[in-house]
Amino acid sequence: MPVGVPKVPFRAPGDEDATWVDLYNRLYRERLLFLAQDINNEIANQLMGLMVYLSAEDANKEIFSFINCPGGSVIPGVGLYRMMQAIVPDVNTICMGVAASMGSFILIGGEMPKRIALPHARVMIHQPASSYYDGSAADFHNESKHVTLVREYITECYIERTGQPEEVIQRDLNRDVFMSATEAQAYGIVDVVAEDPLIFNRFLK
């Protein structure tokens, strides 16, 4: 029998008694966001909405985005990445397990030098794929042009956020490139490998 999302007590300022809210709701109130599934429209919209709300609530207080994401849809992922750049608060990104495909794209979007990977984390980068497998030739042609534009944008972001030369990014996005946490740090995808818990805690104060 599934356990479901645990509930925890929470007392809002001014309330005498605590109410029970689900775990993620409680964590969101502490500006701790979680991307722990494939990126789709629903999860991207939820996270973007939370980022806008938290930015309006306190533009000077950091947001922490914990990532364990195997990939997902390109357009919602690009939208989430752009929202991270648009809001005022710094967004710290923390890779807890895997950041693959669009998950790695969100990981690089964190505020530098506040992109963290846990020691066991794994990162994978590759190019965005088309969503058309069937359909008319016109659909395929239009989608191909769109994918090319998105690929160019993603390539530019990887170049800017990692410091790698364009030829390196172009080459690596043409295949699946897997990295350990330390390899991702050397590549420029993350800034810190939190091998020492004190390093990790410093970012979560």
Swiss-Prot record:
Its EC number is 3.4.21.92. CDD domains: S14_ClpP_2. It comes from the Eukaryota. SUPFAM superfamilies: ClpP/crotonase. GO terms for cellular component: chloroplast stroma; endopeptidase Clp complex. The keyword Ion transport does not apply. GO terms for biological process: protein quality control for misfolded or incompletely synthesized proteins. Keywords: Chloroplast, Hydrolase, Plastid, Protease, Serine protease. It is found in: Plastid, Chloroplast stroma. PROSITE patterns: CLP_PROTEASE_HIS (PS00382), CLP_PROTEASE_SER (PS00381). Belongs to the peptidase S14 family. Component of the chloroplastic Clp protease core complex. Cleaves peptides in various proteins in a process that requires ATP hydrolysis. Has a chymotrypsin-like activity. Plays a major role in the degradation of misfolded proteins. PANTHER family: ATP-DEPENDENT CLP PROTEASE PROTEOLYTIC SUBUNIT (PTHR10381), CHLOROPLASTIC ATP-DEPENDENT CLP PROTEASE PROTEOLYTIC SUBUNIT 1 (PTHR10381:SF15). This is ATP-dependent Clp protease proteolytic subunit.
